[in-house]
Amino acid sequence: MIYQVVLLLLVSPAPVSAAGCNPDCTGIQCGWPRCPGGQNPVMDKCVSCCPFCPPKSAQG
């Protein structure tokens, strides 16, 4: 019974973090993009480990 409780404690945080995003971007080297229209790059580790230009629908 104790092993089941410990296993649940170890496994339960995994789905929570996987559903949110994956912030583990260690060892990845990124550049800084130049976005069209003077937009600032977006930093969202739930989408990408590297900064990226916002979609055109978000620019207007």
UniProtKB/Swiss-Prot annotation:
Cellular component aspect of the GO annotation: extracellular region
Tissue occurrence: Expressed by the venom gland.
Disulfide bridges in this chain: none
Locations listed in the record: Secreted
Keyword Cell wall biogenesis/degradation annotated: no
Protein name: Insect toxin mu-NPTX-Nc1a
Post-translational modification: Contains 4 disulfide bonds.
Main location: secreted
Signal sequence extent: 1-19
Naturally occurring in which organism (per UniProt): Trichonephila clavata
Residues passing through the membrane, by range: none
